[in-house]
Amino acid sequence: MDYNKLRNIGISAHIDSGKTTLTERILFYCNKIHAIHEVKGKDGVGATMDSMELERERGITIASAATHVEWKDFPINIIDTPGHVDFTIEVERSLRVLDGAILVLDSVAGVQSQSITVDRQLKRYSVPRLAFVNKCDKTGANPYNVKDQLRSKLDLNSVLMQIPIGLEDKHIGVIDLVLMKAYYFEGKDGTEIIEKEIPSDLLEEAKSKREIMLDTLADFNDELMELHMEGKEVPTEIIYNATRTGTLALKLCPVFMGSAYKNKGVQLLLDAVTRFLPSPHDIKNTALDLNNNEKEIDLKIDNELPTVALAFKLEDGQYGQLTYVRIYQGILKKGQELINSRTSKKFKVGRLIRMHANNTEDIEFGGSGDIVALFGIECASGDTFCDPSINYSMTSMFIPDPVISLSVKPKDKKSADNMAKALGRFTKEDPTFKTYVDIESNETIIQGMGELHLEVYIERMKREFKAEVETGMPQVAYRETITRKAEFNYTHKKQSGGAGQFGRVAGFMEPLDKEGETYEFVNLIKGGVIPTEYIPSCDKGFQKAMERGTLIGFPIVDIKITINDGQYHIVDSSDIAFQLAAIGAFREAYEKAKPTILEPIMKVTLEGPTEFQGNMFGLLNQRRGIITGSLEDGSFSKVEAEVPLSEMFGFSTVLRSSTQGKAEFSMEFLRYGKVPSTIFDELRKKFNDQNKS
């Protein structure tokens, strides 16, 4: 394989922009599949890249299936990424290992909310991109408008490389503005490309658009600028070089168009991928040297150097765990010994394969820059594999925090075992899916990037792991505390024949206001009124009493306890007697110390178009939010607020519907704060009602 010709590309888009259909056509024209199936087609086959049963049913792409194709002797690895906001980690993951991308846009809807999110991710990983304006056959198609939106909404220097021949139901082909030729796609499935002269009624428009294209490209090539200014003909190769230079420098976004569904324009888009998107040689990648203070090391596309590879996706295959790997340096071959830099464990490379959606092709080795898959390797997503002579780690992928939680409960013993297996699998596969058991409520809580994200996992539990589960709302982790000082003087006495129990503890409790501490114990006992060996028993008893408050049954925090007096009995006093005395003393004083309830307060950040700023403020105010800051950056707004966690459930859905899906939010724990009296009363009533029942 000529690695200078290799292209690692992703296809990113808003949901329903026709991205999976485009990928399907690419597979067909590259002879990887021999029949075309629609995403939600009548034949029940579904798109080839949507290999998970659930994806085919919903008609949305969930897992980024990888496939290897060849176009005119250029090897291309394609990662098909999900277009729904809830699957953002899949997009982030694939962009991490890509060298270039195709941004697919709907010719009617144009730049949509997820296009903005995807573009932000492409920028985060400095991925050069081409734009493909799809669905030019749709009613209301306007590719020129989409090209303008790329500038106004995404701030991309978009340049038309083609114009359409007809739109809506009259869309029959495209005009190439570089070659100044018209292209039609005929024969069954558009496999016959017919090159003709530009129709006379479109010639003037084509000339005018070519002028604009050359003006834009002149910034990237001095020779082109001179020839264009002198009114001379610019050679095709110079135009291609200028386009490639601008694209690789992330200063240009060439725009192509067509209709994947109607088989128009796909082959010319593939030509553009090979011409304008980078090979692994064109991209700088770095690793951190763990043996040298995490010093940044430049990696080289060279098969002779020590191997460095990144595991970027895990799947359960029929032969065990399938690990997708991008090779950044050196080679991967069967039988090779590597080390996982996170665990320091050595392993041997077993079966090495190339993927075509969910079909596999065994290979002997993969070279620098390639994307391959391994079977039977124990690892987590994001792990780095390297030659044992070095200890490098690829910089970690940006992983957004989960924003929604749900409690899950297995319906029976078999489901409980299967659910445990499923949760173990999912957390390994997806770093944005988290799970834990809430110690206080004993519920299993799952967390993710949105309702659909968690729904898909609950469905997968049922289908793949045969785990029947019920879902509910998770409980907020409240706390209790006191608001004033209170004294205690409590005697624990149990004398009913035989060994008795006796212990008296006196002192006071007060609110503790110390950063990072929730409990403090002070011993002011003098003259041995409580023997030294029983002081730890008192401490233990107070801490035991704080495990469950009397208001709503949650742990008690932020209390300082001081003991200054007491009494013991030479026979009946014991460790347990003083523990019980301390528990009694605590409860006696707690009621007098005016206890209250604390709730988790989250730092919430909303980002979205300025036109929705009012909606964002409104949503936060409705949720007892306190706005702490806002920032306007042209058409984009950022709002920061402190909001109680209990008000944030279901927020992603509400935010999406009130901002047309154009705003995003992140949330992290900030501190505990006192609940208002109305909430206090509600929580008390709920707790008392539960205890009665």
From Swiss-Prot:
Sequence similarity: Belongs to the TRAFAC class translation factor GTPase superfamily. Classic translation factor GTPase family. EF-G/EF-2 subfamily.
CDD domains associated with the record: EF-G (cd01886), EFG_III (cd16262), EFG_mtEFG1_IV (cd01434), mtEFG1_II_like (cd04091)
SMART domains membership: EFG_C (SM00838), EFG_IV (SM00889)
Species this chain originates from: Borreliella burgdorferi (strain ATCC 35210 / DSM 4680 / CIP 102532 / B31)
Pfam families: EFG_C, EFG_III, EFG_IV, GTP_EFTU, GTP_EFTU_D2
Intracellular or extracellular location(s): Cytoplasm
Keywords: Cytoplasm, Elongation factor, GTP-binding, Nucleotide-binding, Protein biosynthesis
Coiled coil (UniProt feature): none
A cellular-component GO term for this protein: cytosol
InterPro entries (alphabetical): EFG_II, EFG_III, EFG_III/V, EFG_IV, EFG_V-like, EFTu-like_2, G_TR_CS, P-loop_NTPase
Gene3D superfamilies according to UniProt: 3.30.230.10, 3.30.70.240, Elongation Factor G (Translational Gtpase), domain 3, P-loop containing nucleotide triphosphate hydrolases, Translation factors
PANTHER family for this protein: ELONGATION FACTOR G, MITOCHONDRIAL (PTHR43636:SF2)
A GO molecular function held by the record: GTP binding
First-listed, main subcellular location of the protein, grouped into a coarse class: cytoplasm
Binding site for GTP: 13-20, 80-84, 134-137
Protein name: Elongation factor G 1
Every tr-type G domain range: 4-281
Role this protein plays: Catalyzes the GTP-dependent ribosomal translocation step during translation elongation. During this step, the ribosome changes from the pre-translocational (PRE) to the post-translocational (POST) state as the newly formed A-site-bound peptidyl-tRNA and P-site-bound deacylated tRNA move to the P and E sites, respectively. Catalyzes the coordinated movement of the two tRNA molecules, the mRNA and conformational changes in the ribosome.
